[in-house]
Amino acid sequence: MRWTPGDVSGDIEDRRGSSGPRFGGAPMGLGGLIMLVLLSLIFKRDFVSMFSGTQEVAPTGQASRSMVEDPAETKMVQFVSFVLDDAQSTWDRVLPKEGGVPYRHAKLVLFRDATDSACGLAQTATGPFYCPADEKVYIDLGFYDELTNRFGAPGEFAQAYVLAHEIGHHVQKVLGISSKVHALQQSDPSEANPLSVRLELQADCLAGVWGNSTAQRDLIEQQDVEAGIRAAGAVGDDRLQRMAGRRVSPENFTHGSSAQRAEWFQRGLASGDLAQCNTFAGR
């Protein structure tokens, strides 16, 4: 993927200098302190500092000055900045024209280990996610190593797909799709999972719409396209269930199968057309 390193995006909140979330600085009882000490000994991590309220969160938009960053991570921050700005610039142009509404920018929060979000605690183990309550995407950059090593989806465009998918969820929020789906899930809980799958597949397609924009500008080649398709398929529910040693149970899918995710990403990538991303048609 062709991209140009530049300044960190103004839409990024860099919290990597913070060890974890604060809990209002409330005093901790002796029992709680003992529990944190035990957890620290068991997991070999400093839970005392993390949860005692003594750690300050890095100021919005910048990392702690004391943080030492290796060159590879610096490059990764520049890369996600480029992808974020490019994706949002694309939606600045596409959404008013094809969706009939102006696009408003999401924020991207970079963190290590854990941080607070309006949707609850964001943790490394959770993976990247979009929180509609604060309109922010949360990513621990360490996930990209996992994408390569655990899920077998290396490459910069594969990494870009992950962020573009989460921005796709923000597009759904701006269009009012997310709130409608949530209301339907509340009214009929039996449809919660199928509706979730449709929402996720649509976000895959929206990521593809941005991918089409990069292709039009010769920022990606065929090998990049293949990497993006592999990334979409790598996180299908059926594959994740097999990796966890469980039987494949479509009734428990929340994101769609590998084949479905790859298919919808390719649909957006091939068309570049928002109208082609209607995963709710015929419902």
Show the residue positions of the predicted features.
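A Zn2+-metalloprotease active-site environment signal
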Residues: 6-19, 25-254, 263, 270-283
